[in-house]
Amino acid sequence: MKRDDVILVRGGGDLATGTIHRLWSAGLKVLVLEADHPAAIRRQVSVSEAVYEGGAVVEGMRAALVKTLDEAVVVWQRGDVPVMVDPKGELIPQVRPAALVDAILAKKNLGTTRDMAPLTIALGPGFTAGVDVDLVVETKRGHRLGRIIREGAAIPNTGVPGVIGGYGAERVIHAEKAGVFRNVCAIGDIVSAGETIAEIETPDGIRTPVTTRIAGILRGLLRDGYPVTPGFKVADVDPRREELENCFLISDKARCIAGSVLELIAADLWK
């Protein structure tokens, strides 16, 4: 691997953005491939917002939506990060990245293979190191967070969020029915337990309230107008009301994972 080689990251959600920011900060050339309708809830720290807005800024890093690789080159030349809509990774053979990071966090493999790049890394469960990809990075909060897995897989998804401020499952909110998500509150708002933060509008025009289970800061909220199904993750409340800036900063979890990815890429770079 050479310093000016392309590092391709599949996914632009908040955990992916932690890795993208770390690689960008290290002076590496990063290309992000995203879905056509990303569903990030921590939108203030997700480069996936560029798909909707044309651009995004996270902790000083600018991301820009591009349609061609020629446009991506222009974005790299000004020191920014290009984002392209390519959920299936069809551009990967054309890009020929030196390393590929699957940061989709789908809890399953959506099509990443070891032959996509000389070095392939996946974040979280759904991949087996040495089979699907070269290496896997643990994403579950706890003692093993960020651990590099060279054989085997990450801890399976438990469906139970990690504990923050004494709360786990209570801080994450899911849709109870299908419909269109309509925001009532905004990211950064201080909310009370039981407060309506959004509504789900069903085809018959009825709006069902989406309420919080705990008090705190609304750290994440799905984009207004997004279609949801039962169980769809739509919001995240941080009980630490004194830490409003967390809504706009990359999380400790994302930074821990990012450090492991950078370690692996740096080790390959300095071979």
Language-model regions, residue ranges each:
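Well-ordered secondary-structure scaffolds
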Residues: 1-271
